[in-house]
Each structure stands twice: as C-alpha cells, then as structure tokens.
Curated annotation (Swiss-Prot):
EC number(s) on file: 2.7.7.-, 2.7.7.108
Residues bound to ATP: G102, G104, R105, K125, D137, G138, R195, R202, D287
Chain positions recorded as Mg(2+) binding sites: N278, D287
Protein family per UniProt: Belongs to the SELO family.
Cofactor(s) listed: Mg(2+); Mn(2+)
Catalytic EC class: transferase
Keyword ATP-binding listed: yes
Protein name from the UniProt record: Protein nucleotidyltransferase YdiU
Reactions listed under catalytic activity: L-seryl-[protein] + ATP = 3-O-(5'-adenylyl)-L-seryl-[protein] + diphosphate; L-threonyl-[protein] + ATP = 3-O-(5'-adenylyl)-L-threonyl-[protein] + diphosphate; L-tyrosyl-[protein] + ATP = O-(5'-adenylyl)-L-tyrosyl-[protein] + diphosphate; L-histidyl-[protein] + UTP = N(tele)-(5'-uridylyl)-L-histidyl-[protein] + diphosphate
Organism: Rhodopirellula baltica (strain DSM 10527 / NCIMB 13988 / SH1)
GO molecular function list: AMPylase activity; ATP binding; magnesium ion binding
Active-site residues (renumbered): D277
InterPro entries: SelO (IPR003846)
Annotated Pfam families: SelO
C-alpha cells in the first residue's frame, strides 16, 4: 500500500547503519541509526488526526481515520517505500553529559518527498523497543500522547516553529507507569503519535560522535545535514563542505534557535526539559514532554517535577539555556571546524538575534510600531514586575490590555481606575491581591504606557487598529494545562470529542471564536495543585 506517498530516505542512505540486525538494548558505535520495525499492537483505534499535516505531506485527508492508515500509524504495517529506523544520539541532561541516548521509543518510518520536493520525516512515538530504549519499554501512554498531539498543532497555529503531529492512535494495550516516580505505578492506556518534521536531527546527534572521537561519522552527519537541510549555504550542490560552511550552518542554527525561544517567551510556553537531545538542528520545538503554559505570570515557574528544586529550565531561564546548549553543539563541531573563533561568532549571533527579536516581540505585544530602548526598557521591566505584584494571567492580561481605550494625541482618554480594572479583572486570580498599592502601581504603569503609545510615530490613529495589531501576536487561546488534562480525562473514558474540539479551537488562537470562550478562561481553582495541571513529570 502506498497512499500515493513517495519516500526518499536520505538519512538511511547517507549515514552508516548499525551492523547488528537484532533489536536489543546496547551501545551502538560508528552508526547514525539502527534499523528496527515498530512493535505490532493488539487493537489500534484512531483518536484524532490533522488534516493540515496530511495535506502538508501529500496525503489525501480521506485516509485519516481509515483502517488502512490506522494500521500503519499504529506500527502494525508498513507502506511501500518505508525504511524504519531509530537514531543514535547523545545529550547533556540537566547540564551533565548523559552519554548515548537515542530514539528509545521513537521509530522513524521514512522520509516522504512531496510534489514540491520537500522532505518530511514520519516518526512514531511509542512504537516499541529499540536498541536505545535503555531500561524503558519503548511505549507511550495516552496522557502524554494527547498532550504531544495537541501541543504540536497548537504551537504551529500560534506561529511557533515546531514539529507537527499527523495522528493520535490508541494501541488497545495497557502500559505500566509511575507518573510521579513515587513508587505507585498504575496501568494506563497505550497510545502512539505520528510526529512529522523536515528532520528530527538534534544537537545530540553531533555530540555523541564528538564524545567518542568518531570524527569520520561526525563529518558524514554534518555533510548529510548541510546537503539536506542547509543546501542554500553551498555554492553548488556538490560543493566541498569545509570549516567555513560548517560555521555558517552553526550560525544559522544559532539564529533560528533564538527566534524559536523568543516565540516561546511570547506565548508563555515552558518546554520543561531543554536537554541537548531535545534541541532541533532546525530551530523547531521538539519533544513535548513535561511542558506547560504560564498561566499566572511567574518567571521562575517550571512544570517539570524533576526540575522542581533547581528550576534549571524555568520560563525566564530558557534563553540562557538555549545559549548553553548551543555552546555544547559548538564544542561538538570543533573537531571539524578546527578552531573556536568561527563558532564563537555564532554564539554572538545568538545573543544579538535574541535581543533584537525579544525587543521586536515585546513591541508587538504592546502594540508599538518599534522598540525604543531609551523608554521601553523601563516600560517593559516595570510591566513584568507589575504582573507579579498580584497573581495575573499572562495570556488574558495582554489580550484585555488591547481593549483599553487610550485615545489619540489630540484627544487622549482620561484613564480611570474602575474602567481599567473592569477590563483587567478577568486576568486576576486572587481578588484580595488587588490592593491599593497594586492599583497605584497599575495606574502608574497604564499612564506611562498610554504616553508611550500616543507618542509612537508609527502609532495607528485608532484604538481599534492598535487592538488589531496586538491581537495578532497575543493569543486568546493557548493549550492551558487544565484544558489538556480535561481532554485526557475524557479520552481515558472513551470520549475523544474534547480532543477534536480543542484541536479545532487551537487552529485559530488569535480569533475571538464566539461560543468557545470557555477555552480562554483562566485556570480554575480546582486545577491549581492538581497533577497534570500544575506540575508534570517526565513519565510518559
């Protein structure tokens, strides 16, 4: 069966393969991958699919939900042209070198090439044991799979660079998991997500070969990556790939990584586990594990229970961690570039690009035509302080800020506390925290904000135009942690309608969508400390 898909499996063609054909956990040397087939499951059941992703890879959406496609995306069958494999890579986890990691439960089916000659790798997450599974079982549960499926698509529609998700399928089998590693394992429903990306190559793919001083395989991987994903850096297709080209690739990775993290900060996304094996060479958000969304603005928040003490991967620290990870990648490339200076330039590009993109992003969130450091550094700093004085929902605050009438230079509106609070009260979690001191700080900031907006040379003449500009970058709908948990709870009981409804709402996160307002509500009190809503683990 072909589904009218054409496969061109460049990775398995270009990289050396593991010479051991048997599938058992082991150290794999001098190989970019191991060939391994998905483990068949007993009773696959279609839960949800993305029509946009199907069209992206050239798959007729009519196949979504069909028995034939369900069998393939559950790992029970292979379409013609597929060449399944698991990647070998390493990584730094929480700042420490972890050695070989690899695709422990992800199996790549192959690379689809579309009519416009774009390549898309299809990958099943939770498809069974591989040589890289270590002590795990290679499986995934419904809980984590619903979260990955929904967030992959939500992030894309938010405008955040990300891998995509084609499908979510139940396996019909139970999987034993200890959700919080507290000695109380339970059986959960098994599931598989089909992830889609131009490439799933990570920083850790390069690190593993550098750590083993396997320069030959490292060079092969770099050449494959540049010819496949960075061919625009070559003067001609078969041009030699030397240190200059490798340094140019690294510089581009630094730039796209900066852009990705700025988008995370814009929408309040916290990845939760920014290890180098979870960093895409293409600057895509990858591996949706214990991620979370800032609800009340807390720059020190991390959703990952494993990181609860050190908070290495907290929201505000993500830009610095991305830079740390890029340095780790640079160290892996030094054996090929021969010197550090060209790679140090890439790190400088990251710092510069992040700062520039951050300023542009904050200007957009506030409806300004451009960022002026002389005035806006203080305006933004005081805003971020204000958001912490009272527990304030970040998403709702920016959205409702756009609704406050400021007037024009000729006729500025006189800001009144009651009117401002009427707009912003929806964003406050605890009414008692809206003290007189807070109200004074709020009004001081609002007047500074109004003055800055009305002095903006590029400012639209009408409040409605400012509102339109702000609402284009400040989403109304994000995948709030409690919404994902409600979808999981329903799906666990056999009702997948909320997954489909959420997917539909999250396709238009910047639109008002009358009738869907319940999906824009701030976190309810019952979800404040509930597992899955406030904190998550790496158990999946």
């Amino acid at each position: 069966m072909t589904f009218d898909l054409t496969f061109d499996n460049r990775f398995t063609r270009d990289l050396p393969a593991d010479t051991e054909p048997r599938n058992f956990t082991r150290q794999v040397h001098q190989a970019g991958f191991s060939r391994v087939k998905p483990t068949p499951v007993s009773a696959p059941k279609w839960v949800a699919g993305s029509k946009e992703v199907a069209e992206l890879i050239g798959l007729d959406p009519k196949w979504l939900g069909s028995a034939e496609l369900t069998e393939v995306l559950a790992g029970n069958a292979l379409a013609d042209g597929m060449d399944p494999f698991a990647m070998c890579y390493g990584g730094h986890q929480f700042g420490n070198w972890a050695g070989q990691l690899g695709d422990g439960r992800a199996i790549n089916l192959g690379e689809v090439v579309t009519a416009d000659e774009k390549h898309w790798t299809l990958q099943l997450k939770g498809a069974g044991l591989t040589p890289y599974s270590r002590t795990a079982d290679g499986l995934a549960v419904l809980r984590s799979s619903v979260r990955e499926f929904l967030c992959s698509e939500a992030m894309h529609h938010l405008g955040v660079p990300t891998t995509r998700a084609l499908s979510l399928v139940l396996t019909g089998e139970k999987v034993l998991r200890d959700m919080f590693y507290d000695g109380h394992p339970e059986h959960e429903l098994g599931a598989i997500v089909c992830r889609v990306a131009p490439s799933f190559i990570r920083f850790g793919n390069f690190e593993i070969f550098a750590s083993r001083e396997d320069t030959e395989t490292l060079q092969t991987l770099v050449e494959h990556t540049i010819r496949s994903e960075f061919s625009h850096l070559l003067s001609e297709p078969d041009a030699e790939i030397g240190p200059d080209v490798i340094a140019a690739m690294f510089e581009e990775v630094c730039r796209t990584t900066a852009e990705m993290v700025v988008h995370w900060m814009r929408v309040g996304f916290v990845h939760g586990v920014m290890n180098t094996d979870n960093m895409s060479i293409l600057g895509l958000t990858i591996d949706y594990g214990p991620y979370g969304w800032l609800e009340d603005y807390d720059p020190d928040w991390t959703p990952n229970t494993t990181d609860a003490q050190g908070r290495r991967y907290r929201y505000a620290h993500q830009p610095q961690i991305a830079q740390w990870n890029l340095v780790a990648l640079a160290n892996a490339l030094v054996p090929l570039v021969k010197e550090a200076e060209p790679l140090q330039r890439g790190i400088a590009v990251y710092v510069e690009e992040f700062q520039k993109s951050w300023h542009s992003m904050m200007a957009g969130k506030l409806g300004l035509s451009k960022y002026e450091s002389e005035t806006d550094d203080e305006l933004v700093d005081s805003l971020l302080t204000l958001l912490q004085l009272a527990e304030t929902d970040m998403t709702i605050f920016y959205r409702r800020l756009a609704d406050i009438e400021l007037g024009t230079r000729e006729q500025p509106v006189t800001l009144e506390l009651a009117a401002v609070l009427r707009h912003l009260s929806e964003a406050h979690y605890v009414a008692d925290e809206v003290t007189e001191e807070y109200q004074q700080a709020l009004m001081d900031w609002m007047r500074s904000y109004q003055s800055r907006v009305l002095a903006d040379d590029g400012f639209p003449a009408e409040d409605s135009q400012r509102r339109q500009r702000m609402n284009a970058v400040n989403p109304k709908y994000v995948l709030r942690n409690y919404l994902a948990q409600l979808a999981i709870d329903a799906c666990d009981k056999g009702d997948d309608s909320l997954v489909s409804e959420l997917l539909e709402v999250l396709r238009r996160p910047y639109d008002d969508q009358p009738g869907k307002e319940r999906f824009a509500e701030k976190r309810p009190e019952w979800a404040r400390h509930r597992p899955g809503c406030s904190m998550l683990s790496c158990s999946s």
